[in-house]
Amino acid sequence: MELLRQKIENEGIVLSNQVLKVDAFLNHQIDPVLMHEIGQEFAKLFKHDGITKIITIESSGIAPAVMAGLALQVPVVFARKRQSLTLTENLLTASVYSFTKKVESTIAVSNTHLGEKDCVLIIDDFLANGEAAKGLAAIAKQAKAKVAGFGIVIEKSFQPGRDALVQMGYRVESLARIESLEEGKVTFVREVQS
């Protein structure tokens, strides 16, 4: 997605050969025009898949997920990372290790919002090692929901997340695929157009 690549090039900050900071438009401050376009793109990619729900993880996945939900006209459910006074029973849970925070947490979704009749699109802001994605897939599996695929805003293709999800049989659609963050520079994967 050209608009997203331009945003990454112009406003993304390479902190190391593993970490890209995008808090100017995605992780802290949110660019609503960009999020709208991201939602439209995910809707276009998954419009024939019978999506009934979108699931994501708090908090950076929420904006792109809501925009995709709006475009597809389906509800969005986000997995919580922290305990909530109102989210206490009938929980679907998974353990997830955060690459950027270097901490393991338990994510949870109420089973009243996800079930066996659902066909879900899983959306997240980043795909690195695939831990959050695998955790969300595990929650969908517990609910006996079908996973249509993963919509990833930014994929770090030099890390094993995509390969792990593909080996598990999942479809992965990433709007920006980063090949490298070496020498403080973002290098994108060259996509072959068919």
From Swiss-Prot:
It comes from Bacillus pumilus (strain SAFR-032). This is Xanthine phosphoribosyltransferase. One of its GO terms (molecular function) is xanthine phosphoribosyltransferase activity. 5-phospho-alpha-D-ribose 1-diphosphate binds at residues 128-132. One of its GO terms (biological process) is purine ribonucleoside salvage. The keyword Cytoplasm applies. Homodimer. Converts the preformed base xanthine, a product of nucleic acid breakdown, to xanthosine 5'-monophosphate (XMP), so it can be reused for RNA or DNA synthesis. It catalyses: XMP + diphosphate = xanthine + 5-phospho-alpha-D-ribose 1-diphosphate. GO terms for cellular component: cytoplasm. The keyword Glycosyltransferase applies. HAMAP family: XPRTase. Belongs to the purine/pyrimidine phosphoribosyltransferase family. Xpt subfamily. Xanthine binds at residues 20, 27, 156. SUPFAM superfamilies: PRTase-like (SSF53271). Pathway: Purine metabolism; XMP biosynthesis via salvage pathway; XMP from xanthine: step 1/1. The gene is xpt. Keywords: Cytoplasm, Glycosyltransferase, Purine salvage, Transferase. Its main location: cytoplasm. Its EC number is 2.4.2.22. It is found in: Cytoplasm. InterPro entries: PRibTrfase_dom, PRTase-like, Pur/Pyrimidine_PRTase, Xanthine_PRibTrfase.
